[in-house]
Amino acid sequence: MVAIRLLQLLLAALLLSGCTFFFDVQDSVQPDPEPDSRQQKIIFDRIQQITQSMKEVTRSEVSNVGPNEARSGPEKWTVCSRGNSGNEVRYFTFFLKGETVANWRPAVINDKCETRSFSPFERDR
């Protein structure tokens, strides 16, 4: 009886560890390289569209592509944007997947947007 319980426990542990291994391998097989210059132009154009649609945010600027410092999502790369909202400066984080903006939100401290360099949006980026 003890041998059967031990085998059941061993089988359950083996099956559960296999699931974790499978997902780790899948993530490492599909790397997400930093977007190239063509992809960055598409990304910056999309971010500019999004920031221009924000009624209360003016004079938006954008950072270069950087790592996802907060690691708050599966995306490896981010771009920060900042703009004036009344008397405040607001920061936003845009999460990138290839040449698309997968998601965005108001920046949090862990995004480290305040430490990035910003420049105005340019048509020739």
PLM regions: where:
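Cystatin/cathelin-like cysteine-protease inhibitor module
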Residues: T20-R125
